[in-house]
């Protein structure tokens, strides 16, 4: 039996601290959810074979709409992080193809990767990190070293990440 769903009525009530830090309820309608999903799908291709790792709490608006409802709408697999402290372990364990993250998490991952690359880079190239940005330095390294770095970074992300979806805050 088909059930009529009003596109403008509240569909889900999510609690968030938003930008003020004080908890409040956010009412999302069917239209709100569908607009978010359709807009995202206009930019990225989510496949049934995709696996994602849910890192943020499900009551987080961004997590609920993009990493839960969107992925379920495409028939994708959702895995769940044991805790924020175990995200790195869970990424290698579940080998996600898509990571839906907030900028703070991406910055944390970036910092960890950059530090590891700097520490393990051959001595003769370490001075480049002092002179150039991380991206510029990587571009100046020999192709074989760039490939080795890329392979290790990909492996640290479970070996299958093809897409990061970043949102819910400014990315600088």
Can you say where each PLM-predicted feature lies in the sequence?
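Alpha-helix/helix-capping structural signal
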Residues: 31, 104, 169-170
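Conserved G/P- and acidic residue-centered "switch" motifs that form tight phosphate/ATP-binding loops
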Residues: 18-19, 75, 168
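Conserved AMP-binding A3 loop
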Residues: 11-37
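Conserved pre-ATP/AMP-binding loop-to-beta segment of ANL
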Residues: 1-15, 22, 45-51
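Short aromatic/basic micro-patch
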Residues: 4, 27, 100
